[in-house]
């Protein structure tokens, strides 16, 4: 699973997910993409589950790019612990995803295989997504 090697601070504030994604919202590497339509935190386990399902469906053909990285630690306190005595320890990592962000890209496979593989990966995501196709300079989209 994905996680940073080294961070400046061990614990982060939770923060708010306001607005839409201004970066990482266009297809750069592949021909097909999965785009987020809602804001959410996507865990490293969910990212890995989506990647595995896509690679298994596409078999040997094609290349997959993961366009998000979990760089925010989420802390949890132990069960049945009294209030106070500081913040909990980091348990897992999440990627903060805003609407419009490209999650995965794919190339080297036919459209029907890419669409089916992305649909399987979309089931593993906590937010609504849509399938995008890069057609020269035009983008053709369809909601999954």
From Swiss-Prot:
Q: Which CDD domains match?
A: Ribosomal_L16_L10e (cd01433)
Pfam families in UniProt: Ribosomal_L16
Which Gene Ontology cellular-component terms appear in the entry? chloroplast; mitochondrial large ribosomal subunit
Q: Does the keyword Transport apply?
A: no
InterPro entries named in the record: Ribosomal_uL16 (IPR047873), Ribosomal_uL16_bact-type (IPR000114), Ribosomal_uL16_CS (IPR020798), Ribosomal_uL16_dom (IPR016180), Ribosomal_uL16_sf (IPR036920)
Main localization is plastid
The subcellular localization recorded is:
Plastid, Chloroplast
- Keyword Plastid among UniProt keywords: yes
Keywords attached to this Swiss-Prot or TrEMBL record, sorted alphabetically, are:
Chloroplast, Plastid, Ribonucleoprotein, Ribosomal protein
Q: Name one GO biological process term.
A: mitochondrial translation
Gene Ontology MF, one: rRNA binding
Q: Please name the NCBIfam families in this protein's record.
A: rplP_bact (TIGR01164)
Q: Which family does it belong to?
A: Belongs to the universal ribosomal protein uL16 family.
Subunit composition and interactions: Part of the 50S ribosomal subunit.
Quote the protein name from its UniProt record.
Large ribosomal subunit protein uL16c
Give the organism, scientific name. Chara vulgaris (Common stonewort)
């Amino acid at each position: 699973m994905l996680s940073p090697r080294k961070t400046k601070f061990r614990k982060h504030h939770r923060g708010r997910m306001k607005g839409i994604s201004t970066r990482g919202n266009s297809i750069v590497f592949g021909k097909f993409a999965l785009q987020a339509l809602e804001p959410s935190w996507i865990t490293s386990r969910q990212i890995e589950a989506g990647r595995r399902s896509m690679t298994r469906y596409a078999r040997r053909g094609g290349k997959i790019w993961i366009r998000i990285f979990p760089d925010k630690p989420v802390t949890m306190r132990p069960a049945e612990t009294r209030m106070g005595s500081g913040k909990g320890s980091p348990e897992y990592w999440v990627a903060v995803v805003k609407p419009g962000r490209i999650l995965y890209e794919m190339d080297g496979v036919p459209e029907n295989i890419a669409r089916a593989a992305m649909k399987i990966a979309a089931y593993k995501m906590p937010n609504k997504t849509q399938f995008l196709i890069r057609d020269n300079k035009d983008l053709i989209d369809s909601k999954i």
